[in-house]
């Protein structure tokens, strides 16, 4: 589950049929409430791409990543391959730590438990160590 560390850095788009639990707009609205978040862009420079490769174990596929920001809080929507199919996940990050993780869309035929609060709560307050590993162990399905 090292790909979660990339919530701060990288995502890659996929367009397969999915069971949608939250739309992107619902996730962003829930992250910031009445506060207006600004849509920003993280460009995949050589340095960012190298960091992403260390975290994910593969190179990024796009040249930029859009995210939302208000103050020190950011919201990221990322797509990453689960066992076989893409999973769309949302992460609210504040002060370098994941405050909330959500599954927005799930495309796998098994492992649906990942969308439940009992599984997702293990990501709360998770951050990156200097070596790009997570500072907490994450249990997989």
Can you name each region flagged by the protein language model?
Residues 139-141:
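Glycine-rich and small/hydrophobic secondary-structure elements
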Residues 17-136:
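Flexible, solvent-exposed loop/hinge segments and secondary-structure transition points
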Residues 12-13:
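N-terminal signal peptide c-region/cleavage motif recognized by signal peptidases
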Residues 6-9:
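Hydrophobic helical h-region of N-terminal Sec-dependent signal peptides
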Residues 1-4:
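Positively charged n-region of N-terminal signal peptides that target proteins for export
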């Amino acid at each position: 589950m090292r790909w979660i560390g990339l919530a701060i850095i990288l995502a890659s788009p996929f367009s397969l049929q999915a069971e949608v639990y939250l739309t992107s707009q619902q996730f962003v609205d829930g992250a910031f409430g009445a506060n207006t978040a600004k849509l920003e862009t993280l460009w995949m420079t050589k340095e960012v791409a190298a960091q992403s490769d260390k975290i994910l174990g593969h190179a990024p596929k796009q040249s930029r990543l859009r995210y939302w920001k208000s103050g020190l809080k950011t919201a990221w929507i990322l797509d990453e391959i689960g066992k076989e199919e893409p999973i769309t996940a949302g992460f609210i990050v504040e002060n370098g730590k994941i405050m909330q993780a959500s599954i927005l869309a799930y495309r796998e035929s098994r492992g649906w438990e990942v969308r439940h609060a009992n599984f997702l709560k293990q990501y709360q307050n998770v951050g990156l160590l200097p070596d790009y590993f997570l500072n907490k162990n994450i249990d997989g399905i």
